[in-house]
From Swiss-Prot:
GO molecular function: ATP binding; ATP hydrolysis activity; peptidase activity; proteasome-activating activity
Homology family: Belongs to the ClpX chaperone family. HslU subfamily.
Listed GO CC annotations: HslUV protease complex
Name of the protein in its database record: ATP-dependent protease ATPase subunit HslU
Domain of life: Bacteria
Keywords for this protein: ATP-binding, Chaperone, Cytoplasm, Nucleotide-binding
Subunit structure: A double ring-shaped homohexamer of HslV is capped on each side by a ring-shaped HslU homohexamer. The assembly of the HslU/HslV complex is dependent on binding of ATP.
HAMAP family associated with the record: HslU
Entry-linked InterPro entries: AAA+_ATPase (IPR003593), ATP-dep_Clp_protease_ClpX (IPR050052), ATPase_AAA_core (IPR003959), Clp_ATPase_C (IPR019489), HslU (IPR004491), P-loop_NTPase (IPR027417)
Residues that hold ATP according to the record: I18, G60, V61, G62, K63, T64, E65, D255, E320, R392
Amino acid sequence: MSEMTPREIVHELDRHIIGQQDAKRAVSIALRNRWRRMQLEPELRQEVTPKNILMIGPTGVGKTEIARRLAKLANAPFIKVEATKFTEVGYVGKEVETIIRDLADIAVKMTKENEMKKVKFRAEEAAEERILDVLLPPPEDAWGNKEDVEDRGTRQAFRKKLRQGDLDDKEIEIDVALPQVGVEIMAPPGMEEMTNQLQGMFQNLSGSQKKKKKLKIKEALKLLIEEEAARLVNQEDLKEKAIESVEQHGIVFVDEIDKICKREGNNSGDVSREGVQRDLLPLVEGSTVSTKHGMVKTDHILFIASGAFQMSKPSDLIPELQGRLPIRVELSALKVGDFKRILTEPNASLTQQYIALMKTEGVDIRFDDSGIQRIAEAAWQVNERTENIGARRLHTVLERLMEDISFDASEKSGESFVIDADYVNNHLETLVDNEDLSRFIL
């Protein structure tokens, strides 16, 4: 779980996302509150529920990007889902409870990786011993029994060579555990326990089979370390820790929530829209979901919802769900200045990406300040005249601008190009000024 302060979280988000300080502050406080809650006494901790967030703003202003970056910073089970992928219980499609099941799977994977890191040193030692046993097999007596004769000097010499990598390319034959045969059983929701028992039965029938494999020592060592680490990790403890991690630190980001609102003037009983909201409500309020790893309580899972709300308003959400999203954050539409900053300031900005890509062909690209200003203006103009798709318009404009250089780059190795205002005007002016063309091409 992340122990970063709100200021540190905002600073980290600033490296990738331009502007939108209100949204950054809201998610950073919510993330820090997860840590604060864990410092409380157990009795009080149970009473402190997360303050869920609703992010409102036009498309392409950074809502989804904030979620993506937050996932990396959270160091906790995190899942991003699209609200439009789900349908009401009883209809064909995914049910909202699969969100928690997928989150539990993510937590198990994260916990397994952490637990395997803890036993890595012991696993490495055990893997080394197995390889040394293959390289220096103990002598056998007349009856084929292995004699316990220790030659410490030779073993230590081989161990040293193994650790230095001198034996990496030598081929050996080892016994490797075969992956257990996974039998996928499609069962109705709520019958996960039965499914697990059947899967466990099939896995036990297949048993832990081994197969001889001829591998280079470097590859064999990697395989054996994983095998030994998996053997040292207690699977039951792992599941318990994973479920606790989901319940106490889990974060769910629900994108496109405005698409499941009941639109104004539409009085038809739209099943898939309002029904999904009603199914989502118990998860946000707090309920218990059955997963293949065990029962998961959702009382303390943080939910962050986002939507453009162009065809609907937040008030079109059902009242109970509105009440469960108390923190509202509005993200502002992007201006020319924002576009200019997006092109230059973030880590691995779009201009840096194009410079690096062309460098692989030996072509040197430089973006002049006047060129960047003109690209930003062109993107903003097209957004204003046609559909406003926010920062995503920059991808379209830049791809069109760089098309000629990208196509001829392999024949122009060693050449240099400066992208200034004149270059941008020559390549984009007719497209930007002609509304019909920009509608179809930009």
